[in-house]
């Protein structure tokens, strides 16, 4: 929350060396960092090195809920085994529409 940025490229190199994944929490950087406001990974031009990106809609987007996005091959299994996710409810359509519009404006 102080504007500090992790050295994502160096962390991704270490992760690759140790067969680990890279997860970036963009909760406080969406709408602030990056050419189009996508966050620190976009700012550092390393989005292609990130396996999982997560964030919240309750900060700069001004709604509620959150997200985790990934192209990682094991992403789908996480949706099935993560107990906090399994017991969540879908966001109401009005919240999704509000978040979508806020992201368009950002």
Each predicted region: which residue ranges?
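Active-site core of PLP-dependent enzymes with the aminotransferase class I/II
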Residues: 1-19
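Active-site C-terminal subdomain of aminotransferase-like
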Residues: 18-24, 28, 33-106
């Amino acid at each position: 929350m102080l504007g500090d940025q992790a050295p994502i490229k160096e962390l991704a190199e270490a992760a690759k060396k140790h067969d680990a994944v890279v997860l970036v929490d963009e909760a406080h950087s969406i709408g602030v960092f990056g050419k189009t406001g996508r966050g620190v990974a976009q700012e550092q031009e390393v989005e292609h090195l990130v396996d999982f990106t997560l964030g919240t809609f309750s900060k700069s987007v001004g709604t509620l809920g959150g997200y985790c996005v990934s192209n990682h091959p094991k992403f789908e299994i996480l949706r099935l085994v993560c107990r906090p996710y399994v017991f969540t409810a879908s966001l109401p359509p009005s919240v999704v529409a509000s978040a979508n519009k806020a992201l368009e404006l950002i």
